[in-house]
Design a protein with these regions (language model features):
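Glycine-rich phosphate-binding loops of nucleotide-dependent enzymes
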Residues: 2-248
């Protein structure tokens, strides 16, 4: 297989005596759509923070497209093509929707080649379905639209890896399905490695090809969805029999 776009090798994050991420290894390749699930407090977001340079690992190594970025700050990760969203969308409420996307372009996108689908502000707004809201302040759009906008801002940096942290949280059932379809389109049309944390487990398992399961900071599974929902360790630690049956 080709060099991973993003690879964690025995990655750990400790806060004093608390180990939030415990020697997790995982590799993500171009065109992959990978889900990460686990109970609250499993270390999922902390793992994302380490992958994106927001939090410095305290052990292990982190490689981006073959470069060791273990100790690098978040902006170095972004310059190498790693973009992410957050559980609570981080948009500039006083700026227009279009200006938020333009911020992403100015930050990292203009100097890097990318798909024609990401060539400019208008193209990105069209891709995420916010063209008609371009002139509105970001604070004036709905929470679900702010989630889409944050994805647009991430795409504007023309990433190779897109890390999505609970982008379906708080959405209606129809909005969750629409979000999942958008995520698949981004993977299919842009060739990104997409890594998606989500508590809407049944939706996530329908759309990803591989699932990592974290529990108490450790990786307890890394396999196809069909295998994960039958894994006794995963069922005991997180899914339970009822959820496993629903997701199967």
């Amino acid at each position: 297989m080709s060099t991973a776009l993003l690879e964690a090798r025995e990655l750990s994050v400790r806060f004093g005596g608390l180990t939030a991420v415990d020697a997790v290894s995982a590799a993500f390749h171009e065109g992959e759509l990978v889900g990460i699930i686990g109970p609250n407090g499993a270390g999922k977001t902390t793992f994302f923070n380490a992958l994106s340079g927001v939090t410095a690992p305290t052990g292990g190594r982190l490689w981006v497209a073959g470069r060791d970025l273990t100790s690098a700050a978040a902006h170095h990760h972004a310059r190498q093509g790693v973009a992410r969203t957050f559980q609570t969308p981080r948009v500039f409420g006083e700026l227009t929707v279009a200006a938020n996307v333009d911020f992403g372009l100015q930050f990292g996108g203009r100097g890097r080649s990318g798909s024609r689908l990401l060539k400019d502000e208008a193209s990105i707004l069209r891709l995420i379905g916010l063209t008609d809201l371009a002139a509105l302040p970001a604070a004036a759009v709905t929470p679900s639209q702010q989630r889409l906008l944050e994805i647009g801002m991430a795409l504007a940096t023309r990433p190779r890896v897109l890390l999505l942290d609970e982008v379906a949280a708080g959405l209606t059932e129809a909005e969750v399905e629409a979000m999942a379809q958008l995520i698949r389109r981004l993977r299919d049309d842009l060739g990104l490695a997409v890594v998606w944390i989500e508590h809407a487990v049944t939706t996530l398992l329908r759309h990803v090809e591989r699932v990592l399961v974290l529990h108490q900071g450790r990786k307890i599974a890394d396999d196809a969805p069909a295998a994960v929902v039958r894994d006794p360790t995963v069922i005991e630690a997180y899914l339970g029999d009822e959820m496993a049956e629903a997701a199967a």
